[in-house]
Each structure stands twice: as structure tokens, then as C-alpha cells.
Amino acid sequence: MSRVCELSGKAPMTGNTVSHANNKSRRRFLPNLNDVTLISDVLGQSFKLRISAAALRTVDHRGGLDAFLAKARDEELSLKALAIKKEIEKVRATAA
């Protein structure tokens, strides 16, 4: 299982742990990933995704999974999230 957020694309970063004596040792900064189930209002389905805590707050702020995916850039989304986005767009196009 990769350590990349499916909605925001956040991935591990590298850097230094710096001690009080200014000694530096390499470390990894891992994203805070959580397994969550999000519900699409348009599709009436639930989807299990592995997303970061920051992405979960953004989904809530934008008003749900459908609104988040409508604004999200395709480059940041995983293949699974991109498929959900295309399916939502298709249903909205037929409904309009």
C-alpha cells in the first residue's frame, strides 16, 4: 500500500532531524493518511479511499466528495478517484 493521498497527491518528503547541538540526521516526513468511506450524493454510492487528514478537512469544507472532485485537478487524483470524478461528470451531464 503506497503512502500517497488519493485525493491531494500528498506523498512522503525527506529532510533532516536537527538536534539542539545542530547535528543533522536524515528522516522522512510521512503524510497523515486515514482509510475513510466517503459518500457521493450524485451517484448514491460510498467509496473507500486512503486520504490525508488535510484532504478530509478540505472535502468537508467544499461540501462533500462531489464538490471536491469537481474542483480538483486531474494530475493530483489517483486513478480510482479520477474514475469516480468521470462517473460523476457523466451522470451530471445526462441529468442536465
UniProtKB/Swiss-Prot annotation:
Q: Where in this protein does the record put region Disordered?
A: 1-23
Query: What is any one of the record's Gene Ontology cellular component terms?
Result: cytosolic large ribosomal subunit
- Superkingdom classification of source: Bacteria
Assigned keywords, A-Z: Ribonucleoprotein, Ribosomal protein
- What InterPro entries has UniProt attached to this entry? Ribosomal_bL28, Ribosomal_bL28/bL31-like_sf, Ribosomal_bL28_bact-type, Ribosomal_bL28_sf
Recorded GO molecular functions are: structural constituent of ribosome
Could you mention a single GO BP entry for this protein? translation
Q: What is this protein called?
A: Large ribosomal subunit protein bL28
Q: Which organism is it from?
A: Cereibacter sphaeroides (strain ATCC 17025 / ATH 2.4.3) (Rhodobacter sphaeroides)
